[in-house]
Design a protein with these regions (language model features):
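Generic N-terminal amphipathic, Lys/Arg-enriched alpha-helix
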Residues: 2-16
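Residue-level signature of catalytic and energy-coupling elements of molecular machines
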Residues: 26, 87, 132, 214
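Translation machinery proteins
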Residues: 23-85, 106
Length: 231
């Protein structure tokens, strides 16, 4: 408990919630408060100028970042026939139809990504209460409902990052590790920002990206100047 209190005190001394920092300054803060036990993830939060209450303004997507997170990704694929063979050949960890659905219902497996062929969505659609809360429900916008299951598996395994807005209109996504250099984080963040800009809803009004914050797994949320993320 004393270590936690010490770290909290350290964070309060380092971060003024009213200030906006450059990327370099933010990375210095994360380095000072990083855990000695593991390499913490670095997440980005974008406050968007959207109305999250309107379904056509929710933003979600996927991107393969310039610098991979180096995480081992476990993939489950709902498919049969040729698509199932393609999935197995591409290295999917779990492939099936009703049998795979039963494994999810019984919580027998834990995966990072779920992919489905279009035909298999009739089965996946019954798993909304199981996959939805975990953010695993396949969606065409993220390339996880597709006829090109092999390509989708390859993208997932290569470290493709998925992002989406929450109920408050804030978009979340992981862009690296605390051990990454500032230039690596900048390149990943810039790629994320460009992808999010492409997905701006046609009905969104006013400024689109209102503010940006970075946070580490164990560290603080730090407001960052969007200009410092642009290459």
């Amino acid at each position: 408990m004393s270590k936690l209190t010490k770290k909290k005190k350290q964070l309060l001394e380092l971060v003024n919630p009213e200030n906006t920092y450059s990327l370099e300054e933010a990375m210095n803060i994360f380095q000072k408060v990083k855990s000695n036990n593991f390499d913490e993830s670095l997440d980005i939060a974008l406050r968007l100028g959207i109305d999250p209450g309107k379904s056509d303004q929710n933003v979600r997507g996927a991107i393969t970042l310039p610098h991979s997170l180096g995480k081992t990704v476990t993939v489950a694929v709902f498919a049969d026939g040729d698509h199932a063979k393609e999935a197995n050949d591409a290295g999917a960890d779990f492939v099936g139809m009703e049998d795979l659905a039963d494994k999810f219902k019984k919580e027998e497996i834990d995966v990072d990504v779920v992919i489905s062929s279009q035909a298999a969505m009739k089965i996946v659609g019954q798993l909304g209460q199981v996959l939805g809360p975990k953010g695993l429900m396949p969606n065409p916008k993220t390339g996880t409902v597709t006829e090109k299951v092999g390509e989708a598996i390859s993208n997932a395994k290569s470290g493709q990052v998925r992002f989406r807005t929450d109920k408050n209109g804030i978009l979340h996504g992981c862009i690296g590790k605390v051990s990454f250099s500032s230039s690596q984080i900048q390149e990943n963040a810039a790629a994320m920002l460009e992808e999010v800009k492409k997905l701006k809803p046609a009905t969104a009004k006013g400024a689109y990206i209102r503010s940006v914050a970075l946070s580490s797994t164990m560290g603080p949320g730090v407001k960052v100047s969007p200009a410092s993320l642009v290459i």
